[in-house]
Regions:
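Small/flexible residues
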Residues: 5-6, 156, 167, 205-207
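Conserved polar/disulfide-associated segments of primarily extracytoplasmic proteins
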Residues: 56-185
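Sec-dependent N-terminal signal peptides
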Residues: 2-14
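N-terminal targeting sequences that direct proteins away from the cytosol to non-cytosolic compartments
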Residues: 2, 17-73, 177-216
């Protein structure tokens, strides 16, 4: 009985490790090639550093595979962040589906994305165990330093009709010269937000190249 218990425990341990092991996506400096969900090639600027990959179960509901890339200054202060995430609800959560209400969309390389933007303090309202918590921890663990505030655009592509799988790309920039509160409603630079947002979207489209390796 003890032997059977040990074997079962070892099997469960191996199974858990297999679930958590990074997928076989290829990272070559500034390029990610995924062979499934979706089949895609994502190319970032050659100036980026690949921080690393984190595979984890998000809030007990989704399997997430997170890739982080940064552009930094000489003191390793993050100036730009490229956050690429492949996410799939767990089979044990069949009733869950992604819902995005953004009216804005962008098509890159044949992939249609929902588009959202925001500005925030880097350490503002980070939920323990969230994907944001994971990426900040990964970046800091490599000796990089996060800026006080960032301006960000999130691109989300839903892979399937059931809306259970997604490719998410977040592009963020150091908010130089402003505090996040300055650009929010009622802030002293609120009138500049739309212009800064438009410029951010242009740069995101220019800096992130996406190509389907088969029909998306």
């Amino acid at each position: 009985m003890l032997k059977r218990t040990i074997i079962l425990a070892a099997f469960v341990g191996c199974l858990a490790a297999a679930v958590q092991a990074p997928e076989r996506k290829v990272v070559n400096n500034n390029i990610i090639i995924s062979d499934h969900d979706p089949k895609v090639r994502i190319e970032l600027p050659k100036s980026v550093w690949h921080v690393g990959v984190d595979r984890f179960i998000l809030q007990d509901i989704a399997d997430c595979e997170l890739y982080a890339f940064v552009e930094v200054d000489d003191q390793k202060n993050v100036q730009r962040l490229y956050w690429i995430q492949f996410e799939d609800y767990l089979p044990s959560k069949p009733d869950l589906h992604h819902h995005y209400e953004s009216p804005r969309h962008m098509t890159i390389g044949g992939f249609r994305f929902y588009v959202d933007t925001w500005v925030k303090r880097t350490n503002e309202n980070i939920t323990a165990g969230s994907d944001e918590d994971h990426i900040v921890a990964l970046i800091l663990s490599r000796g990089y330093k996060m800026p006080a505030g960032m301006i960000s655009v999130r691109l989300v592509h839903l892979l399937d009709e059931q809306k259970r799988k997604e490719l998410m790309i977040i592009y963020s920039e150091n908010l130089t010269g402003f505090a996040p509160a300055d650009l929010k409603k009622g802030g002293k630079a609120e009138n500049l937000w739309l212009s800064l947002e438009d410029d951010l979207l242009v740069r995101a489209r220019q800096e992130i190249k996406i190509e389907a390796t088969s029909k998306p």
